[in-house]
């Protein structure tokens, strides 16, 4: 049977975790120069000598094509074997939504296209291309005629348009903004005639005759781009590539920022497109028994007096986008689990690290649900999201990929993350574009020094408690996805921008409350529950896509207090979760309207609810603690860890903390971790006193 995302099921392979030391991964940008004269051998020797990394993630960039076996198979086989001999694991970085984005093969002249920068690798089977829809509206003239023109938009510059195709046309009588008179809607797609067309635009005529004179018309135009659609083509490309590397000593795939084709609305008009592909349409028709083109129209218009049609259509589109992005992630994880003994499943789907950015479009902000053992984020992801992602992971550790051309920014990321059970995924050796390339000194030596110092915490944190979290913030994904019917709330990325969920989480964090942010899809997944008087967050089940809910085989993170932001349009299981917890006396407050479910049917919440966000009021209502400390993290059992730039400067950092009624004073020289009844874990020269009493002599912990 052909392997597609319509049918994904492989046997699970158990995870084997050895030792207490956490992996130290680094992206390695592999370009044409890397392959020339086996430069990668020298690069591996350099990385072994000058970094603390133990996982290499080669990333094909300019001049290389990840799926070109003639170019990549032999070098990757030798690269992986030599790296393994030098003590590295190798996980190939992948990108399947934009084939050839950085490649430069001969450009097919038949396309007659022009593009700035490196020439792209054109998709051979254009039925595999991803499309964005463009809505074109007009009015039929006195003879029932209209000519409508559509032009490709919202694509990033290097993702070039390949062709345009009219998908559907409807005529109706408008009954106000976004409504039509019931009974007036007619599908006239069979009458569409393309009269002008190139790769970027097309003109479509409708000539319906005098009976249609003056009626409104809606054209759903599809513009297909040089990007693989996600339902079948992306996984097929992944499988072909990794099957081609079957004889290379790889340890997994770094599935980086995967999802739908990237879009662009940063400087221009707001994004109002929808994704379309022929494979996706087939899934809607066969599995969901739905006319997908009609659903795309229903997302824009509803019969007068029945706004629920539009609400349901928007929610259904978003729900399926969630499913298919996760189906691809599950399929890639299943492939690795079936073929590698202990794959390093990585990495993040944070794209621009914001719920109110194109992350919402590209992968539905699925950060918390990726089938990984560790939690992955990147760059400037806010702390409540970082904490929520790591607490929902199996290993209860996170990685934040980071790059900058400023060394101090990189040092700061490593230092700030470490107390919170987060390590840096370094980016990138041989980086010629985004940040430093790990050949600069003293930068590279300093990063190695930081990595080695932070490893003192590995064993301490593995054996210890989780970060003390004052409040769990859960937001309603459908409320965030669906602005309708409030036009004023409609954001640049076609989401509900009025909720400002991240701003609220940041406000709580800056007020000193340790807050973890999660979406309510974790309730749907069976991972967030109320049990034994607390909210329990179970880890992602490392198993097949067939039954991800079954393997709750690792202990959950537990929270006493929860604030639910905006339950409108939530699924019934979420309403049951909220009302069930409230009935059992949970410390729970709901913020915002609580009136409708995902199908626009009536719903209600019987517990404590406030109409608007008011942190002071909510903090008083729930008696929220403020557990943040400067330069470190307090854990659930009262233990704590501190990390500072003293690792590099040699200047001791002063300690003066009050935790659980005890006062801790002294100083540390970069890393210090304390747990009652255990020897102090710290860098040399550190001293710690508890209520004036010396707590003991520091000893380095075993990584």
Set out the residue ranges of the language-model regions.
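Carbohydrate-binding surfaces of carbohydrate-active enzymes
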Residues: 22, 34-36, 40, 55-57, ...
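"Short basic amphipathic alpha-helical interaction patches in structured regions
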Residues: 106, 269-270
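Mature N-terminal, pre-catalytic/accessory segment of carbohydrate-active enzymes
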Residues: 5-261, 335, 633, 681-703
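Secretory pathway export signals and precursors
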Residues: 4-5, 542
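Glycine-rich loops and low-complexity Gly/Arg-rich segments
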Residues: 116-118, 371-372, 587-588
